[in-house]
């Protein structure tokens, strides 16, 4: 099981990393060809997809489907799975019809709310209509994708994701070279997503057929159990979504497409890094579900402890480097257009930095409703802090006040979120505080030195950027390995090597 987890994690890292790079490459192409306003309009329409703002309303269909299939691989009751997936499928279709109808009928009102100018109204409305139609496929696809994740077939998911992203980027570059209208970019993106969803559907049917699972009428007990999980996930997604994917929509309400384009460009790199780490841990959900089904509490605890200490060890240095070197990154990536806002791009990295301590706990405790409810409550506190800070600074910083609110809210609530996970994992307080404290000190001191160094060295190429950031990360990793990790943590590395056949077993 652990070997499969490592294998799936590597697949997710490589495939989504490549797809993320392609996605970042295409943003300056869109902005330079069609403008920030047009880019903002494209972003607004993507918010209405399950991968965007609408994710807060998806009832956790993908996560619940993953848990259902993963648990079935332990208890082997595939008839029960058939009933459960039947209910989730019907629920997803009803949700898709409701979402699509709301988008189609609400298109005229959305153009007014987003302050779309007369020159773009008709084309923007057409994109909204096609987005509504695409959701009829993309919302049920959440169940299909969750099913494939439950079988831990991450190679298929990531390959299809990379292929669809590559097709989108290539066709967008082509549209740029032939001076096509900006709405073509939106249509290319929708087509790529729908084709990928159909490929995942084929994989879902194949996997379920192999196990002999058949769709069947569900029982009242099945319906109540699944609805309870869905509503609990909905609560967390609603709260988390307001401080995440809904923010570009809020920027559009106050500042129009230009504000959306500016906001999205400033937070895109930090958001991609956050999603990338989320995908690294997405392979954990089926494993955690199977461990919970088995009652393997010791392994479950060990998994959570490694996530709280070792994941930040690897992921925080690149994020800190991205924050400190934001002026250089923004200049090379977008150009001089948004260079004056580099400070805000750096501030946006605070959000994924805070998330690193929570991401694995948030995933594995999807199987523990009590802990999840506590985390949801803390998210609501974070939301209140975000709203207060953003409202107080909206007149000073425009759309950038949303970034400030997120950063402050994340920092204020983080200690309580970490403590909730520590208590749930029964970790000893003193040793845990020591590990996190030393880790924070290393990163603060290292980031300060990097900031001074960046003011003296001209970082004006990707090679120089990679060398400076890479050196910083390497020094940070070595320092944390020596000063933060205990012997039992370090033992994980040779164990993984043995498991993957990369190191000989000791006698």
What is each stretch, according to the model?
Residues 1-24, 32, 62, 79-87, ...:
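N-terminal membrane topogenesis motif
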Residues 1-5, 182, 186, 200-245, ...:
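Interhelical loop/hinge segments that connect adjacent transmembrane helices in multipass membrane
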Residues 4-19, 58-112, 126-132, 297-318, ...:
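Membrane-water interface segments that mark the loop-to-transmembrane alpha-helix transition
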Residues 15, 19-23, 27, 46-51, ...:
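Short runs within selected transmembrane alpha-helices of multi-pass transporters and secretion channels
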Residues 30-53, 84, 182-187, 222-233, ...:
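Interfacial/gating helices of multi-pass transporter permease domains
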Residues 58-75, 150, 208-213, 266, ...:
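Helix-loop junctions and terminal segments of transmembrane helices
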Residues 107-131, 313, 322-354, 425:
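Interfacial segments at transmembrane-helix termini and the short loops linking adjacent helices
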Residues 423, 427-429, 451-507:
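Membrane-proximal transmembrane or re-entrant/amphipathic helices at the cytosolic face
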């Amino acid at each position: 099981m652990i070997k499969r987890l490592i294998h799936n994690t590597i697949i997710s890292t490589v495939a989504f990393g490549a797809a993320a790079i392609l996605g970042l490459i295409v943003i300056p192409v869109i902005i330079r060809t069609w403008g920030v306003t047009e880019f903002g309009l494209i972003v607004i329409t993507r918010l209405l997809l399950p991968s965007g703002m609408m994710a807060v309303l998806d009832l956790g269909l993908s996560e619940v489907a993953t848990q259902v299939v993963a648990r079935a691989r332990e208890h082997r009751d595939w008839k029960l799975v058939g009933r459960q997936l039947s209910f989730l499928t019907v629920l997803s279709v009803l949700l898709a019809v409701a979402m699509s109808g709301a988008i189609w009928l609400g298109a005229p009102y959305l153009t007014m709310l987003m302050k779309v100018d007369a020159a773009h109204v008709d084309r923007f409305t057409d994109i909204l209509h096609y987005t509504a139609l695409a959701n009829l496929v993309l919302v049920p696809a959440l169940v299909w994708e969750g099913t494939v994740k439950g079988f831990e077939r991450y190679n298929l998911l990531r390959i299809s994701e990379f292929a669809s992203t590559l097709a989108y980027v290539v066709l967008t570059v082509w549209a740029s070279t032939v001076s096509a209208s900006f709405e073509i970019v939106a249509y290319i993106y929708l087509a790529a997503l729908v084709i990928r969803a159909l490929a995942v559907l084929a994989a879902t049917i194949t996997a379920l057929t192999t196990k002999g699972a058949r769709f069947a009428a569900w029982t009242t007990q099945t319906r109540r159990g699944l609805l309870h999980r869905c509503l609990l996930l909905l609560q967390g997604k609603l709260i988390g979504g307001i401080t995440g994917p809904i923010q570009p929509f809020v920027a559009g309400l106050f500042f129009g497409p230009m504000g959306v384009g500016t906001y999205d460009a400033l937070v895109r790199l930090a958001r991609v890094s956050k999603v990338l780490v989320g995908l690294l841990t997405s392979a954990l959900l089926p494993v955690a579900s199977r461990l919970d089904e088995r009652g393997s509490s010791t392994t479950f605890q060990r998994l959570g402890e490694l996530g709280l200490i070792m994941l930040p060890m690897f992921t925080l240095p690149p994020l800190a480097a991205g924050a400190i070197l934001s002026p250089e990154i923004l200049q090379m990536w977008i150009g001089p257009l948004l260079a004056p806002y580099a400070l805000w791009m750096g501030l946006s990295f605070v959000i994924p930095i805070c998330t690193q301590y929570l991401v694995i706990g948030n995933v594995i405790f999807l199987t523990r409703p009590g802990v999840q409810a506590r985390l949801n409550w803390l998210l609501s506190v974070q939301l209140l802090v975000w709203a207060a800070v953003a409202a107080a600074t909206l007149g000073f910083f425009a759309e950038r006040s949303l970034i400030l609110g997120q950063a402050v809210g994340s920092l204020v609530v983080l200690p309580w979120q970490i403590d909730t996970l520590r208590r749930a994992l029964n970790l000893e307080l003193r040793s845990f505080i020591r590990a996190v404290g030393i880790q924070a000190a290393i990163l603060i001191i290292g980031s300060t030195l990097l900031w001074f160094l960046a003011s003296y060295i001209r970082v004006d190429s990707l090679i120089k950027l990679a060398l400076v950031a890479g050196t910083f990360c390497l020094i940070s990793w070595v320092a944390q390995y020596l000063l933060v990790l205990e012997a039992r943590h370090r033992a994980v590395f040779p164990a993984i090597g043995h498991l993957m056949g990369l190191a000989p077993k000791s006698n």
